[in-house]
């Protein structure tokens, strides 16, 4: 999973 996806959470 990309870090950006985790940032959007």
From Swiss-Prot:
Location, primary (coarse class) = secreted
Entry keywords, A to Z:
Cell wall, Secreted
**Location relative to the cell:** Secreted, Cell wall
Q: Which GO terms describe its cellular component?
A: extracellular region
Q: Which domain of life is it from?
A: Eukaryota
Q: What is this protein called?
A: 57 kDa cell wall protein
**Origin organism of this chain?**
Nicotiana tabacum (Common tobacco)
Q: What is the lineage of its organism?
A: Eukaryota, Viridiplantae, Streptophyta, Embryophyta, Tracheophyta
